[in-house]
Amino acid sequence: MTSTTHPQAAAPAASTSLAGKTVVVVGGKSGIGFGVAQAARAAGATAVVASRRLSSPQERPDLAGFQQVSLDIRDESSVRAAFDAIGVFDHLVVTAAPDLGTWGAFMDADMSGARSYMEGKYLGSWACARHGSPHLNAGGTITFLTGGMAVRPKVGFTAVTSAFAAVEALSGSLAIELAPTRVNTIRPGFIDTDMWAFLPAEHRDGLRKKVEETFPARRAGKPE
């Protein structure tokens, strides 16, 4: 995890309790985002899940009890409208990531795939912070999500590494500019979610096998 909080000597101590707070999770309907939303609700917070499409109770009965709002991270007007609709809140967690598009070695990739991922991951995070922060209550926080590839590049993931590094730089900059709002980035390890569905099955299986052989826990992480 990279912590980029800007120290403020005069800032009051922030409460760690989520009881009675409102937590907005962008990308909160699946994967790590849904795990965050579930944990926030269990801790007594109102959890707002933001995603491109609203789901009916018939489609997603597991979303009962969560507030939903439509937000497309690639569309700044959509992001602005979503936060205007949400109103004041306490904590923002941005976990959303776009589909990678074309996956493979750098020399086999094209600019459209790289642009799509950078727009979704980096500029989407930028837009959420830009239009969400005016609605944050005092003592609020912004948390971004990246991954180990920000500092440990792998073949075939040039766009991901570049976008993750950009988000971490954004986090450091905002920690200074938005202080005393706390801004941090979390780098989770390998979490077995649908995020990896874009990979061919043999590559996914290879990743899981490597995790089981090399990680201390001998297993992949789970969102919860």
Regions found by a protein language model. Give the residues of each.
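Hydrophobic structural elements of the Rossmann-like NAD(P)H-binding subdomain
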Residues: 93, 143-145, 183-186, 196
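Rossmann-fold cofactor-recognition segment
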Residues: 61-76
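Conserved Rossmann-fold cofactor-binding substructure of NAD(P)-dependent oxidoreductases
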Residues: 74-88
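C-terminal helical subdomain
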Residues: 181, 185, 204-224
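Short beta-loop-alpha junction of Rossmann-like oxidoreductase domains
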Residues: 190-200
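Conserved NAD(P)H cofactor-binding loop of Rossmann-fold oxidoreductase domains
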Residues: 93-103
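Catalytic loop of short-chain dehydrogenase/reductase
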Residues: 105-118, 122-123, 127, 141-179, ...
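N-terminal Rossmann NAD(P)H-binding glycine-rich loop of SDR-like oxidoreductase domains
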Residues: 29, 37-38
